[in-house]
């Protein structure tokens, strides 16, 4: 068996739907947003959108509508999922707790029926008498809205019109009436029917209109006084109500297709329309009052307001503010202005909501060589196309920065005895010291009486008896706070320079070469208590008081040169309590005693970025549990700071890290800064609970995030990215992208807008010897859209487009790899293409082009003609493996720099995906699931090892390990196949067994090995192996990792218990939601643990936790089973949350 854990690292971000109404209360205006399986509820306030609650549905939200039945004080929410679970939800708030109550629920799936091509449509009668659903061709399903019905019961009415494009309920009709656009062999027509609840059938409707525009696609029901319906087409907009017919064909709407609409005014006089190019229009209905006082429609008018993100849905909120929900780009809150700006636009973006979808491709890279992966995704499409750089870490929010190079240390001070907060920052430089006064948010340089400024400071701070201390290379200086004056000074008896110092509020230890001196701080006096000689020179010191020692430390931690040791000595006698040899050549640079979660530790950082940490017994001074991690590559400086009343340690280096403890394990979290040399906590009036951070050139003051989270940076391309790969030698990314151009009158094409490929620093164009341009069987006509494909070379630091290489006309770039081939020392970008013509069912020719990028130039090294589309390529043992239409082919790279075919494998329908491990090749097919090949180097050919005989339409594949293979298919499921090497017969061995099945509810475009968290840092007892990330169409990033059998069984038990305790919204069974489901079959999930459900354990109340753990058997690592406590499970789950 194969045991896996699937969890969300980034929830879906693409918006599939949005509605507005009064859901949380009659007074609140709410915006409800559907992001695939997640429902987000906001209140619209004067300040913007305020999040109220986020609900995870056990299903993909297909329909979401607010309605208010008679007798209700606020709106109810109707939701239908893709697996046909329907529910009516109500918002209930009591005190702090918010509940979403399921008023009624049921499944409305038919056992037979062909799901409609135009998807699921759900509509609600304006009088709230019924809900109408168009799920299958030829059927209209009705759910009567009875007040007290807990179960949603539905019945079907036969529809003669099989191919319905869109349907709506009309306003102001005695009986519920539907109006719909349908297609038949003659064209498209509009028809209406009355729905009779009693007879459960249709009656003849009030009007119909035959032969409307051939592209008519949307019905908008218009409220009274007008009534009737508006039909939106590709070129025309028409209004019908039986006795009135109005048509307009504004040229402005022809360029693109209108895809969404929303009513602005309750009386239906204005509508917003959004098209596929991201343009926003206003449709105005002009009225005319008749003699008898009735109102009729006089005219329709369309105005272009401006440009937004490409809208999937629109909803008008209030005061000219519109929410634009987007699937292809970031969603927006926009303001509609009365007057246009210089560009002629009436639209201004107020706020942007990040969307990673659709993630078409991605790669994991460690750009800063920080041992932590960053994910770079190809996100968005058309003008919304972008690269997104995603990394996990603790964010620092910068509030001020000052250019100050060469800082060697910094300390906060309270210069005034009556202050609670810091008002001064002391900065140390080589040979000098500077003092900054903090006045509110203002920072100015000043001088402190009693301080010296012509020496480097080693320590500075507030100490006992309302005094300040400054330790410089020459002396230890004690200064009274009021008035500021030097009251005591200690110098080394021979006047030698101090090399290292440590100080707390009442004690000082300084090192002069090998000698150590211990001083105590008294009123107006520094008193030398003792001194000693060490065997070697002292490299670092610490006397941080631990435990309840009243601010006095009985211990001194010392790091020495030469023998590379860490020692614990007793104060005041300097008696050696423990000596720890650290080994190696690199000296300790920073040593620190600290307490995390009431356990004491000694941390010791070396000059190469390594960190040792030990348990410390403060009674005996003994060290235990030695562990080592690597935090960077440069000397590391350790400083403590407090955040959320817990102690944290900040490790300053080229890879700044925050160290804290969780469940008595140390956790190391990346900080999202390039490098930090020194830091100190700062709590001033203008900068409360902040940190001051110094690097080589700058001093920064900022606040720190409480938790790790994903940080996303956007690099807009304004065109569609398709594939990405990273090339370390040239420090570049290769990106395949495509832009849309339009055929102009001269026969050439022009770009619609400036984008990455048209604005690169340099560019080149393919000229192929292989294809003469006249072979194109297809002539484009004026106004036709053409895709132009490019290879972009993008700098890994600045993300600037350094070069754009344009491919041939009609040539689509499909695959990309960066690799070395054979014995050739060069690294190449290799692109696989296809010549795409509309009249060909599948491409008949393509190319493999080998590029080299060096010294800012892109050169074509070789090209190879192939008879088909190069869907996928990977480097394979120094050769190039490619899938071309149905063939898997291996090329070797000759000394003449040409690709030569070595062997082929033909047994596929369409080989779309390739992954390799050792000599094994996993092939993902369009419809024939996955196949495992082995390359036989001696014979120089492929051998078919095994295949999955289930017909899965693949969207991505990955190799988990030698025997387990992960697949994603087009019905939103994941599965794992296993190679059965131990099988007795050949026939069994040739079957890949499906051992894992799981319904993800997301369309996976890409899998890749890698992780978003620091690897192998600190102790981890997470029983997981490997980490495969995946990116989906909705912008979700997920992770699949493998479990041992015992852990799988524990988590499975926990999952089943959680399902009894956690009530799902809409009363949908978790087992139903996660069951593997295609048009062919439905099977229960197996071999996968739902990590999102397991992690929800941390969010439930303590009594509910107790309910989950009751009688749960747990092995705590001792080999013995015992009953688990809630805290045991909290530990387990917190460990699991750390993998993403």
Swiss-Prot record:
- Where are residues bearing N-acetylserine located in the sequence? 2
Annotated pathway: Protein modification; protein ubiquitination
At what positions is Phosphothreonine found?
1125
Cross-link Glycyl lysine isopeptide (Lys-Gly) (interchain with G-Cter in SUMO2) maps to which residues of the chain?
1121
Q: Carries keyword Repeat?
A: yes
Question: By its UniProt entry, which InterPro entries does this protein fall under?
Answer: Beta-prop_RSE1/DDB1/CPSF1_1st (IPR018846), Cleavage/polyA-sp_fac_asu_C (IPR004871), Quinoprotein_ADH-like_sf (IPR011047), RSE1/DDB1/CFT1/CPSF1 (IPR050358), WD40/YVTN_repeat-like_dom_sf (IPR015943)
An example of a GO molecular function for this protein is: DNA binding
Q: Which residues carry this modification: N6-acetyllysine?
A: 1067
Q: Tell me, which GO biological process terms does this entry list?
A: DNA repair; positive regulation of gluconeogenesis; proteasome-mediated ubiquitin-dependent protein catabolic process; protein ubiquitination; regulation of circadian rhythm; rhythmic process; ubiquitin-dependent protein catabolic process
Q: Where is this region: WD repeat beta-propeller C?
A: 709-1043
- Region annotation (WD repeat beta-propeller A) maps to 13-356
Q: Which domain of life is it from?
A: Eukaryota
Task: List locations, semicolon-separated.
Answer: Cytoplasm; Nucleus
Describe its PTM? Phosphorylated by ABL1. Ubiquitinated by CUL4A. Subsequently degraded by ubiquitin-dependent proteolysis.
Q: Which UniProt keywords apply?
A: Acetylation, Biological rhythms, Cytoplasm, DNA damage, DNA repair, DNA-binding, Isopeptide bond, Nucleus, Phosphoprotein, Repeat, Ubl conjugation, Ubl conjugation pathway
Interaction with CDT1, as annotated region: 2-768
Q: What is its main location?
A: cytoplasm
Q: Give me the ranges of the annotated region Interaction with CDT1 and CUL4A.
A: 771-1140
Q: Where is this region: WD repeat beta-propeller B?
A: 391-708
* GO cellular component entries: Cul4-RING E3 ubiquitin ligase complex; Cul4A-RING E3 ubiquitin ligase complex; Cul4B-RING E3 ubiquitin ligase complex; cytoplasm; nucleoplasm; nucleus; site of double-strand break
Q: How does this polypeptide assemble, per the annotation? A: Component of the UV-DDB complex which includes DDB1 and DDB2; the heterodimer dimerizes to give rise to a heterotetramer when bound to damaged DNA. The UV-DDB complex interacts with monoubiquitinated histone H2A and binds to XPC via the DDB2 subunit. Component of numerous DCX (DDB1-CUL4-X-box) E3 ubiquitin-protein ligase complexes which consist of a core of DDB1, CUL4A or CUL4B and RBX1. DDB1 may recruit specific substrate targeting subunits to the DCX complex.
| Family designation | Belongs to the DDB1 family.
- Entry's free-text remark on domains: The core of the protein consists of three WD40 beta-propeller domains.
What job does this protein perform? Answer: Protein, which is both involved in DNA repair and protein ubiquitination, as part of the UV-DDB complex and DCX (DDB1-CUL4-X-box) complexes, respectively. Core component of the UV-DDB complex (UV-damaged DNA-binding protein complex), a complex that recognizes UV-induced DNA damage and recruit proteins of the nucleotide excision repair pathway (the NER pathway) to initiate DNA repair. The UV-DDB complex preferentially binds to cyclobutane pyrimidine dimers (CPD), 6-4 photoproducts (6-4 PP), apurinic sites and short mismatches.
Put simply, this protein is called: DNA damage-binding protein 1
Instruction: Provide the gene name from the record.
Output: DDB1
């Amino acid at each position: 068996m194969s045991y896996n854990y699937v969890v969300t690292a980034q929830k879906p971000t693409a918006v599939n739907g949005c509605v507005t109404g009064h859901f949380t209360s009659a007074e609140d205006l709410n915006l409800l947003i559907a992001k695939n399986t997640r429902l987000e509820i906001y209140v619209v306030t004067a300040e913007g959108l305020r999040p109220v609650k986020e609900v995870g549905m056990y299903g993909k939200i297909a329909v979401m509508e607010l309605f208010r039945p008679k007798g209700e004080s606020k709106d109810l929410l109707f939701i239908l999922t893709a697996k046909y679970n329907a529910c009516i939800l109500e918002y209930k708030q009591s005190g702090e707790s918010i509940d979403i109550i399921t008023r009624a629920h049921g499944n409305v799936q038919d056992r037979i029926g062909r799901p409609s091509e135009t998807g699921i449509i759900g509509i609600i009668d304006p009088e709230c008498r019924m809900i109408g659903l168009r799920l299958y061709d030829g059927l209209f399903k009705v759910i009567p809205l009875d007040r007290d019905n807990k179960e949603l019961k539905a019945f079907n009415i036969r529809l003669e019109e099989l191919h319905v494009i869109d349907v709506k309920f009309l306003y102001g009709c005695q009986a519920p009436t539907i109006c719909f656009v349908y297609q038949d062999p003659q064209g498209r027509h509009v028809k209406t029917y009355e729905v009779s609840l009693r007879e459960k059938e249709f009656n003849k409707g009030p009007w119909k209109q035959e032969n409307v525009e051939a592209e008519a696609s949307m019905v908008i029901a218009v409220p009274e006084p007008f009534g009737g319906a508006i039909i939106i087409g590709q070129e025309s907009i028409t209004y019908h109500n039986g006795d009135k017919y109005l048509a307009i064909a504004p040229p402005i709407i022809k360029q693109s297709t209108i895809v969404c609409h929303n009513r602005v005014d309750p009386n239906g006089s204005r509508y917003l329309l959004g098209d596929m190019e991201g343009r926003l229009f206003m449709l105005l209905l002009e009225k005319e009052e008749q003699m008898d006082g009735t109102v009729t429609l006089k005219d329709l008018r369309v105005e272009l307001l401006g440009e937004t993100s490409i809208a999937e849905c629109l909803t008008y909120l209030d005061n000219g503010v519109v929410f634009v929900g987007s699937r292809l780009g970031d969603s927006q809150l926009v303001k509609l202005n009365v007057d246009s700006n210089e560009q002629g636009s009436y639209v201004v973006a107020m706020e942007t909501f990040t969307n990673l979808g659709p993630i078409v491709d991605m790669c994991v890279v460690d750009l800063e060589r920080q041992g932590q992966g960053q994910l770079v995704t190809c996100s968005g499409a058309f003008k919304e196309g972008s690269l997104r750089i995603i990394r996990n870490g603790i964010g620092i929010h910068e509030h001020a920065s000052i250019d100050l190079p060469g800082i060697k240390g910094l300390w906060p001070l309270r210069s005034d005895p009556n202050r609670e907060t810091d008002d001064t920052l002391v900065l140390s430089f080589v040979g000098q010291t500077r003092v900054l006064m903090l006045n509110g948010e203002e920072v100015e340089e000043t001088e402190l009486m009693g301080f010296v400024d012509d020496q480097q400071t080693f320590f500075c701070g507030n100490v006992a008896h309302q005094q300040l201390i400054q330790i410089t290379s020459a002396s230890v200086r004690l200064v009274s706070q009021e008035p500021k004056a030097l009251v005591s000074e200690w110098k080394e008896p021979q006047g030698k320079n101090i090399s290292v110092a440590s100080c707390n509020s009442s004690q000082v230890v300084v090192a002069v070469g090998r000698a150590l001196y211990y001083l105590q701080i008294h009123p107006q006096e520094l008193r030398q208590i003792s001194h000693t000689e060490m065997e070697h020179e002292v490299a670092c010191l610490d006397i941080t008081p631990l435990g309840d020692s009243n601010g006095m430390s009985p211990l001194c931690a010392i790091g020495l040169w030469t023998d590379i040791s860490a020692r614990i000595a007793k104060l005041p006698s300097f008696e050696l309590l423990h000596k720890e040899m650290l080994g190696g050549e690199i000296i300790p640079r920073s040593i620190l005693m600290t307490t995390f979660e009431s356990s004491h530790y000694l941390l010791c950082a070396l000059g190469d970025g390594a960190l040792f940490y030990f348990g410390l017994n403060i009674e005996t001074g003994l060290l235990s549990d030695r562990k080592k991690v690597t935090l960077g590559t440069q000397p590391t400086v350790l400083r403590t700071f407090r955040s959320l009343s817990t102690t944290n340690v900040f490790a300053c280096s080229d890879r700044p890290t925050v160290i804290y403890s969780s469940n008595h394990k140390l956790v190391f979290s990346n900080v999202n800064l390039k490098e930090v040399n020194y830091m100190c906590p700062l709590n001033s009036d203008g900068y409360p609970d902040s940190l001051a951070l110094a690097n080589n050139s700058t001093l920064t003051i900022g606040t720190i995030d409480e938790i790790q989270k994903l940080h996303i940076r956007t690099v807009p391309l304004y065109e569609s990215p398709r594939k990405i790969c990273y090339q370390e030698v040239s420090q570049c990314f290769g990106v395949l992208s495509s832009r849309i151009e339009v055929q102009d009158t001269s026969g050439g094409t022009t770009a619609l807008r400036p984008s990455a490929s048209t604005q690169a620093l340099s560019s080149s164009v393919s000229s192929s010897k292989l294809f003469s341009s006249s072979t194109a069987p297809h002539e484009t006509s004026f106004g036709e859209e053409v895709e132009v494909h490019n290879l972009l070379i993008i700098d890994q630091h600045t993300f600037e487009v350094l070069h754009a290489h344009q491919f041939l006309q009609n040539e689509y770039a499909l695959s990309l790899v960066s690799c070395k081939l054979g014995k050739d020392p060069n690294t190449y970008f290799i692109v696989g293409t296809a010549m795409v013509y509309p009249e060909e069912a599948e491409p008949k020719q393509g190319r493999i082009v080998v590029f080299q990028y060096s010294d800012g130039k892109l050169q074509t090294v070789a090209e190879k003609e192939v008879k088909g589309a190069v869907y996928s390529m990977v480097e394979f043992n120094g050769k190039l493996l490619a899938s071309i239409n149905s063939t898997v082919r291996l090329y070797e790279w000759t000394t003449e720099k040409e690709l030569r075919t070595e062997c082929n494998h033909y047994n596929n329908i369409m080989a779309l995906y390739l992954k390799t491990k050792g000599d094994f090749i996993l092939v993902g097919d369009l419809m024939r699931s996955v196949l495992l090949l082995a390359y036989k180097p001696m014979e120089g050919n492929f051998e078919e090892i095994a295949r999955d005989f289930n017909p899965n339409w693949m969207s991505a594949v990955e190799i988990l390990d030698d025997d387990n293979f992960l697949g994603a298919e087009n019905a939103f499921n994941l599965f794992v196949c296993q190679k059965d090497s131990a099988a007795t017969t050949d026939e069994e061995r040739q079957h890949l067994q499906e051992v894992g099945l799981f319904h993800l509810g997301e369309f996976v475009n890409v899998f890749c090995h890698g992780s978003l968290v620091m690897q192998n840092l600190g102790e981890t007892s997470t029983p997981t192996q490997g980490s495969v990330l995946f990116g989906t169409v909705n912008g979700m990033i997920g992770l699949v990792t493998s479990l041992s059998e015992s852990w799988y069984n524990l988590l499975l038990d926990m999952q089943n218990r959680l399902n009894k305790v956690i009530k799902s919204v809409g009363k949908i069974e978790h087992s139903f939601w996660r069951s593997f489901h295609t048009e062919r079959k439905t099977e229960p999930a197996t071999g996968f643990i739902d990590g999102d459900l397991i992690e929800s354990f941390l969010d439930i109340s303590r009594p509910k936790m107790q309910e989950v753990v009751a009688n749960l058997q747990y092995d705590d690592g001792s080999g013995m089973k015992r009953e688990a406590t809630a805290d045991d499970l909290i530990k387990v789950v917190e460990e699991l949350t750390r993998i993403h």
